[in-house]
Amino acid sequence: MPIQLECLSHTPLHGYVDPAPEVVAEVERVQAAARDRVRAFDPELVVVFAPDHFNGFFYDVMPPFCIGAAATAIGDFKSLAGKLPVPADLALSLAESVMAADIDVALSHRMQVDHGCADALAALTGSLHRYPVIPVFINSVAPPMATLRRARLLGDAVGRFLSRAGKRVLVVGSGGISHEPPVPELAGASEEVAERLIAGRNPSPESAARQARTVAAAKSFVAGDSHLHPLNPEWDRAFLSLLASGELTAVDGMTNDAITRDGGKSAHEIRTWVAAFGALAAYGPYRASLDFYRAIPEWIAGFATMHAEPAAV
């Protein structure tokens, strides 16, 4: 059955700290074109590879990968909130198949997803519930993290299952590329911050303060008065070109230290793109198109969108 891929950056800062209106308009135009592609494809299932930002996953149990058999979007920043229409039996079968492929993946019957998942669904489908969706969490901010090779193999295992599922499937990678927003770290954290990173579920009294800190960090970043890692368009474009080339195993040589050095601490979200392309590659050779790339300091992100499909289509 057919498969289609859409990968895109996300930002919680849209509407809080925005670039020039023409840049926002260009991003919205590109996302509207992606929605048109999705609408024309009319998927019977959406699989979203997405990170989390200490909103749903914490250090009390931090899996490298997790498949959601039931999930709710928490609505952080201005993202959509509500229950996702997860086909539980299919998600369970997916988890069993991935485990049988020797990829150790966790399973959640009460997954919480944040803007990293919800914004992608909103951009591509206009809602959280237009299509059945299975969220696949990939840890991208909380060391230690799985390698890019493991993310690729996760995607391959997911893709092999989907190729036998008899459905039109949209696979989505949400995250990246180079960026380093002010995400807290456990190493060196105060006792209060460490406790939130370990067991900080449902921290509604703190959410407004966290959002304010992120907005303030974006304003400082734009003003050039920031310690955050600079955006790296050259590195971004090299990574995007690698995905487009079809030589996906080349990501296996990218180490976690090198990703942090070149792209910033949150550039590890490229794992979601790698997994999505891994799922597509399980169907065979593919052709990919880079629809948009721009370094957007206001959003603290190298911002990109790509789409791809099997070469035989």
UniProtKB/Swiss-Prot annotation:
GO terms for molecular function: 3-carboxyethylcatechol 2,3-dioxygenase activity; ferrous iron binding. Keywords: Aromatic hydrocarbons catabolism, Dioxygenase, Iron, Oxidoreductase. Its cofactor is Fe(2+). InterPro entries: DHPP/DHXA_dioxygenase (IPR023789), Xdiol_dOase_suB (IPR004183). SUPFAM superfamilies: LigB-like. It catalyses: 3-(2,3-dihydroxyphenyl)propanoate + O2 = (2Z,4E)-2-hydroxy-6-oxonona-2,4-dienedioate + H(+); (2E)-3-(2,3-dihydroxyphenyl)prop-2-enoate + O2 = (2Z,4E,7E)-2-hydroxy-6-oxonona-2,4,7-trienedioate + H(+). The keyword Transport does not apply. Pfam families: LigB. Its EC number is 1.13.11.16. Pathway: Aromatic compound metabolism; 3-phenylpropanoate degradation. The active site is at 115 (proton donor), 179 (proton acceptor). It is an enzyme of class 1 (oxidoreductase). Catalyzes the non-heme iron(II)-dependent oxidative cleavage of 2,3-dihydroxyphenylpropionic acid and 2,3-dihydroxicinnamic acid into 2-hydroxy-6-ketononadienedioate and 2-hydroxy-6-ketononatrienedioate, respectively. Also catalyzes the cleavage of catechol. Homotetramer. Belongs to the LigB/MhpB extradiol dioxygenase family. This is 2,3-dihydroxyphenylpropionate/2,3-dihydroxicinnamic acid 1,2-dioxygenase. The lineage of its organism: Bacteria, Pseudomonadati, Pseudomonadota, Betaproteobacteria, Burkholderiales.
